[in-house]
Amino acid sequence: MLVEGSELQSGAQQPRTEAPQHGELQYLRQVEHIMRCGFKKEDRTGTGTLSVFGMQARYSLRDEFPLLTTKRVFWKGVLEELLWFIKGSTNAKELSSKGVRIWDANGSRDFLDSLGFSARQEGDLGPVYGFQWRHFGADYKDMDSDYSGQGVDQLQKVIDTIKTNPDDRRIIMCAWNPKDLPLMALPPCHALCQFYVVNGELSCQLYQRSGDMGLGVPFNIASYALLTYMIAHITGLQPGDFVHTLGDAHIYLNHIEPLKIQLQREPRPFPKLRILRKVETIDDFKVEDFQIEGYNPHPTIKMEMAV
């Protein structure tokens, strides 16, 4: 198709997929679609799932933060886990000590032994997300080793490229390292993210190979939205969009009834996220630097984690 030169404007708006009035409706419609059309599949945990392959949603980060409201999302867990990733830690006990126990089951003695990691300390998850983000390609020894200067610091390279060459199409961070997969307590579900700069805004697209719609996906949406806010802050940009692309999007069979309750609820306005001080580097962020305002979710819905 030919386009008249007068229509080509450097300041043209970024094309956006059609999104419903409230961003959360995208998530709820995905859940409804999987319940209606999903294929019943067996899975690693033995729980069983309803599964659909290939879904996408776009959440605006402009003056709102996509922390789902049709149930309470564990904001403290989102924040502490992301700071733990950024630190490069692979020690589940560091999170546990802060009241965030989402990695406890995968770092337990029984689980590690079941994978053949009997020589590994309890809590040592292997070269998972934080290690790949900050030390990709380094040889993993254990969770207590000092990896300073080893491997590729993908996160810092992302930040540096956004500052120096924002139009680059290779602003990518990848946690999927085939060499290290056999050493991980859990291979990465959220595998690769790409950043995009236009009109002074930073957007992020996540490719998530495996999405647990009941428990994991609401958490992952908030986590990568938060990462986008953080990187935008230190690169002098405004948050744009978070685009969430799912591979195997699934509902565990024991989550169907809880999710039916969630689908009956009307979304409430998304909260706002404030960063309370000027932070210069990604490693300097602290828990107290963030404030969620106006979060008024529906009550918690209990769902069991499949391990």
Curated annotation (Swiss-Prot):
Residues binding dUMP: 44, 169-170, 189-190, 209-212, 220, 250-252
Bias (Polar residues): 7-16
GO molecular function ontology, one term from the record: folic acid binding
Disordered: annotated segments: 1-22
Catalytic residue list: 189 (nucleophile)
Phosphoserine, modified sites: 108
Entry-linked PROSITE patterns: THYMIDYLATE_SYNTHASE (PS00091)
Catalysed reactions, as listed in the record: dUMP + (6R)-5,10-methylene-5,6,7,8-tetrahydrofolate = 7,8-dihydrofolate + dTMP
Enzyme Commission numbers on file: 2.1.1.45
Name under which the protein is recorded: Thymidylate synthase
Signal peptide: none
Function: Catalyzes the reductive methylation of 2'-deoxyuridine 5'-monophosphate (dUMP) to thymidine 5'-monophosphate (dTMP), using the cosubstrate, 5,10- methylenetetrahydrofolate (CH2H4folate) as a 1-carbon donor and reductant and contributes to the de novo mitochondrial thymidylate biosynthesis pathway.
Protein's organism: Rattus norvegicus (Rat)
Principal location: nucleus
Keywords on record: Cytoplasm, Isopeptide bond, Membrane, Methyltransferase, Mitochondrion, Mitochondrion inner membrane, Nucleotide biosynthesis, Nucleus, Phosphoprotein, Transferase, Ubl conjugation
Keyword Lipid biosynthesis: no
Cross-link (Glycyl lysine isopeptide (Lys-Gly) (interchain with G-Cter in SUMO2)): 286, 302
GO cellular component: cytoplasm; cytosol; mitochondrial inner membrane; mitochondrial matrix; mitochondrion; nucleus
Binding-site positions, (6R)-5,10-methylene-5,6,7,8-tetrahydrofolate: 212, 306
